[in-house]
Every structure is written in structure tokens, then in C-alpha cells.
């Protein structure tokens, strides 16, 4: 378990639901349900058709406040579990509810000691794994896979960098780091924001001039503009 709290920059408000949804690759409606829950639905005669949906992912953000970097990471991890491993949403809900019962840090999915197999969620504890979906059962680390190669972790034990997919393909050239470019997408090797490069191009500068001025390749500038256009869509 992390011995310290996450770095403050990781929990600051940073992303609207729409922005976070584009980074993660889900609809804004889906992300809103995960973090805010959903209202009950009723029939015309007033009978309940569906009860109110409780949030799955905890967040300190208020109803209209931006999400933090760690919120973004948790949404990415949840989406990855659902998409890649067909992980039942009910299992995630059980895990979050179990953590809440003993007041543990609720940013479980953004922590380095998070593990998963195809049917359970675990946290590292005392060199073993505590099953959150089996409510306290311990497991052997060797039977599990830790993953999510799009994330790197910091010395605080929490996610530090996020490399979002581009056109559903892994990439390591563009990164989201909460301490760089205000947490927005930037060129990994330089820390230059894709939005800044796109703004210069939109203002009429040639790509080749931008690349030379910033010490970048022409491809870096082209890809930055593509990232900007994709996230602005």
C-alpha cells in the first residue's frame, strides 16, 4: 500500500467530463454515470422502471467541478478492464464499497499496487494481495497479471503519467502528466503541449518553422496537430 498521499497536483481539478471522456475513449454520458451516478427512471404512470444508479468511481469533485488526474486514470483503468477483460461492473462496485467500509484510500485503480486478473480486483498488502471483490481474501501474486502499460507510476505510489491510445493503438510519444502543460497532452520527450503547437499552426505559421523553432521533427508537429484536432472534436 502507498505510504504517503498522492502528490497534490494529481488531485487538483483539471478536466471537464467531456475532456476526460475523449482522453479515455468513452462517451461523456458513460463517464458521468461512473462518477456521478444516474437518476431513477419512471414510467408515464409514475412507477419506477429503473432505480437510481449509484456512482461506481469515487471522486472529490463536486457535481459541476472538473475531474482530477487520478480520476482520469481510474476511468481509464475501469474502461480497460471492461473492454479487454469483460470485467463485470458489479465486481468493481463491490471492490469500491469494500474499500469504503474501512476508510482506505479510494483511488484504488490509480495505485501502483493495483492488480487484476480476469475476475477479481486486488491491492498489494504485506507482500500479498488483498482481494477487494472477495472482501478480504488473500491471494498469491504469481497467479495474477499487473498491467495497463499506458501508465507509469511515481514515488508516491500513484499514477504519474498516462499515454492514451491514438486511433486505438498504443503509443509512447505523447503523454498526459499532471505536472506538465497543466495536465494536457504534450510531447513526451520535450514536454511541449500539443495545443500550443496547434495554436501556432492555426495562427498561420508553417509546420517546418514551428519544428525548427522548438527543436522538434516535422512529424512531431504533425502528430501534435492531429492530437489537438482529435481531442477538440
What are these regions (language model features)?
Residues 1-33, 39, 43, 48-52, ...:
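Long, charge-rich, low-complexity intrinsically disordered regions
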Amino acid at each position: 500500500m502507498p505510504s504517503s498521499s498522492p502528490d497534490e497536483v494529481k488531485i487538483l481539478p483539471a478536466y471537464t467530463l467531456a475532456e476526460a471522456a475523449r482522453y479515455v475513449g468513452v462517451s461523456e454520458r458513460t463517464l458521468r454515470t461512473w462518477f456521478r451516478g444516474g437518476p431513477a427512471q419512471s414510467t408515464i404512470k409514475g412507477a419506477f422502471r429503473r432505480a437510481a444508479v449509484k456512482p461506481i468511481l469515487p471522486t472529490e469533485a463536486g457535481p459541476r467541478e472538473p475531474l482530477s488526474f487520478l480520476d482520469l486514470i481510474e476511468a481509464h483503468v475501469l474502461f480497460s478492464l471492461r473492454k479487454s477483460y469483460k470485467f463485470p461492473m458489479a465486481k468493481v462496485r463491490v471492490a469500491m464499497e469494500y474499500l469504503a467500509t474501512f476508510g482506505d484510500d479510494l483511488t484504488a485503480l490509480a495505485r501502483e499496487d493495483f492488480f487484476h486478473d480476469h475476475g477479481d480486483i486486488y491491492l498489494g498488502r504485506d507482500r500479498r494481495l488483498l482481494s477487494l471483490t472477495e472482501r478480504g481474501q488473500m491471494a498469491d501474486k504469481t497467479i495474477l497479471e499487473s498491467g495497463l502499460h499506458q501508465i507509469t507510476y511515481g514515488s508516491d505510489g500513484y499514477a504519474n503519467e498516462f499515454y492514451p491510445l491514438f486511433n486505438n493503438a498504443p503509443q509512447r510519444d505523447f503523454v498526459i502528466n499532471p505536472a506538465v502543460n497543466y495536465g494536457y497532452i504534450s510531447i513526451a520527450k520535450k514536454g511541449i503541449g500539443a495545443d500550443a503547437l496547434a495554436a501556432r499552426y492555426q495562427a498561420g505559421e508553417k509546420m517546418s518553422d514551428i519544428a525548427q523553432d522548438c527543436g522538434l521533427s516535422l512529424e512531431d508537429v504533425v502528430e501534435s496537430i492531429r492530437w489537438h484536432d482529435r481531442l477538440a472534436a
